[in-house]
Regions:
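N-terminal secretory signal peptides and thylakoid transit peptides that target proteins
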Residues: 1-16
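C-terminal segment of N-terminal export signals and the immediately downstream linker at the start
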Residues: 20-52
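Iron-sulfur cluster-binding cysteine motifs and their immediate structural context
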Residues: 23-29, 51-73, 97-124, 130-147, ...
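Short, solvent-exposed loop/turn segments at the edges of secondary structure
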Residues: 34, 87, 145-150
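Short amphipathic alpha-helical segments
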Residues: 35-39, 88, 116
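Mid-chain, structured segments of secreted extracytoplasmic proteins
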Residues: 70-99
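Cys/His-clustered metal-coordination modules, chiefly Zn-binding fingers
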Residues: 153
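Extracellular glycan-interaction patches encoded by glycine-rich segments
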Residues: 157-163
């Protein structure tokens, strides 16, 4: 394939414009007091063992029947005997503009200014479930013991506070 000088310069111009715009979006997203936590789940390495779910449950004292994160198995891919599955992590995405924070009538759902983590203050939560209805990822739940909203908080009150990584990592 040969490119004319005009096609090349047009392509470079488009690339520069797109790169500049993408950089501004990333910079805006990452600028919460200089810190922004994020979770990357490498689906190519996940075998679906759910050890991450068990570790989360143990460290954060989440009872059986509910979970702060879920590993979802895909439909089978391929034909027997060469069937493969893919595994996906489903947990809080800590949205930039979190609908759960916007709808909370008591301010229990909030974004931590120091880390950017969207969290729930159980002392303020009245269990109205507005945040559960507003969550586009359907990852919040009512904790069966405390009767308050709960979700992934990157182990903010447990492992992160002790200088460790989240339990699921």
């Amino acid at each position: 394939m040969t490119w004319s000088r005009r096609q090349f310069l047009t392509g470079v111009g488009v690339l520069a414009a797109v790169s500049g715009t993408a950089g501004r979006v990333v910079a805006k997203t990452l600028n919460i007091n200089g810190v922004r936590y994020g979770m990357v789940h490498d689906e190519s390495l996940c075998i679906g063992c759910t050890a991450c779910m068990d570790a989360c449950r143990e460290v954060n004292k989440v009872p059986e029947g509910v979970s702060r994160l879920t590993i979802i198995r895909s439909e089978p891919q391929g034909e027997f005997p060469d069937v493969k599955y893919r595994f996906f992590r489903k947990s809080c995405q800590h949205c930039d503009h979190a609908p759960c924070v916007d709808v909370c009538p008591t301010g229990a759902s909030f974004r931590d200014a120091a880390s950017g983590i969207v969290d729930v203050n159980p002392d303020l939560c009245v269990g109205c479930q507005y945040c559960i209805a507003a969550c586009p990822y359907r990852v919040r739940f009512i904790h069966p013991v405390t009767k308050t909203a709960d979700k992934c908080d990157f182990c903010r009150k447990t492992n992160l506070q002790a200088g460790k990584l989240p339990a699921c990592v």
